[in-house]
Amino acid sequence: MDSPQKVVDHQPFCLSLKCFVKTLRLVVTVASMIFFIVAQAPEPYIVITGFEVTIILFLIALYMCSLDKTMRSFFWPLLDVINSVVTTLFMLIVSVSALIPETSTMIMVGGVFGFLTVICTVADCALMCQKLRFRPHGPYQNRSATDVDDS
């Protein structure tokens, strides 16, 4: 008698909530960067937001091409969480710095979009932490005794 095959419930990245949150994060960060560029804000504002846009594009490309499943040497969800924490700190500092002094309206709008980036980044971090907590994979997954016998 044939053994039952495992049903894999695989949803492509483009249709997942993670993709929606990352895309929203990318759009809001790009909007913040555009406002900073148009307002000729201080260079650190533009550089930090540009750096964040580059990292988000890299992560979206990584997940779209399923390279996180191919390159097993890194634990990608943990790197994504660390990136989200660092992005939250940097964008919070940039947004507060843009809103505190009396600046132009465009810089203030860029700061507001920076705060929206922080909110999207926290949501992305919470989503990744939930994935780490409830669905571990790879060498970090707890294996049962029956899984060890099958190997």
Swiss-Prot record:
Highest taxon of source: Eukaryota
UniProt keyword annotations, A-Z: Chemotaxis, Cytokine, Glycoprotein, Membrane, Secreted, Transmembrane, Transmembrane helix
CC annotations in GO: extracellular region; extracellular space; membrane
Residues of the MARVEL domain: 13-133
Pfam families xrefs: MARVEL (PF01284)
Keyword Cytoplasm (UniProt): no
Positions of transmembrane segments: 19-39, 45-65, 74-94, 107-127
Single GO MF annotation: chemokine activity
Tissue: Both isoforms have highest expression levels in testis with relatively lower expression level in liver, spleen, lung, brain and heart and barely detectable levels in skeletal muscle and kidney were barely detected. In most tissues, isoform CKLF2 has higher expression levels than isoform CKLF1.
Glycosylation, residue list: 142
InterPro entries in the cross-refs: Marvel, MARVEL-CKLF_proteins
GO biological process per UniProt: leukocyte chemotaxis; lymphocyte chemotaxis; macrophage chemotaxis; neutrophil chemotaxis; secretion by cell
Family: Belongs to the chemokine-like factor family.
Function (record text): May play an important role in inflammation and regeneration of skeletal muscle. Essential for embryonic development.
Record PANTHER family: CHEMOKINE-LIKE FACTOR, MARVEL-CONTAINING POTENTIAL LIPID RAFT-ASSOCIATED PROTEIN
Protein name: Chemokine-like factor
